Amino acid sequence: MGLSALLVSDIRALPEPQGVKRASVPGFTSFLCLNENQYVIAVFVAHAVFYFDGIQMTASEEQKSQIKSKERVSERGEVFTAEREVNAMCDLVADECLRPDSRFLEPACGDGNFLSVILQRKLSELKRKYRKSPRDFEKLSILALGSLYGVDIMNDNVLACRERLFRIWDAEYTALCGSNASDEVREAARFIIGRNIINGNALTLMCVDGEGKDTTAPIVFSEWTLIGTTQMQRSDYTMSDLLMCHEEGSLFAPLLEDQKEEGGIFLRRYVTHYKKVHEHS
């Protein structure tokens, strides 16, 4: 899969490709471009724009580990980004990959090549800072999980990505917290991952069924925010409404009251202990 990376100070400075439709998401700002003969997924994070060009589909020896089958490549254009490119691209926004609250969206996440590397970097930084404070590591590692979002049309990819992220988190959590590790926190972690990694179509903004066909349910993202020392707030928004919000800043930027009422952007909100977020399913 061909790819390139471009650093810009403003997403609006990017040239508009001819015949291409763009939708921007403020914050981690991710946008999708589509025309008749190619698809391009561009992820804008902290002034870095990553382009994934879906035209080249030949499977050389180097690319074989990047595909699951020729049929999936032909039917879905499914080609995974190699580890070398993943790390090189993450290095462009290295500081953001260390912040537990810096949000990332991968609108075609596959089994989590990008999200897993970002999570590992976030957890490594938390471990460096809070090695002697298991409680702080526990709380902030949950926040780090809540900062990662992914959408994929293939259900097996979604399940694999969720499990991959959980295992990475659980290994670090268990190693650092030892006997203080809690199954209740593990359940909360699985719940957050399940909410954030969605089986859906990022082009139509709808959830899909087991065959990859659109359902009537829209893709909904949850914003996870720590309040005080132990409370976590979850706020739900539809992806389609987030795409309609053009204010720059955070993905979940504060919205005006009339936007909330007229656009129906905000769906629901819960506040609870970070260990008990799964109780509001």
Where are these regions (language model features)?
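Low-complexity, intrinsically disordered or signal/transmembrane-proximal segments
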Residues: 18, 38-39, 47, 51, ...
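N-terminal amphipathic/hydrophobic targeting modules at extreme N-termini
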Residues: 20-21, 28-29
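SAM-dependent methyltransferase catalytic region
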Residues: 48-49, 57-281
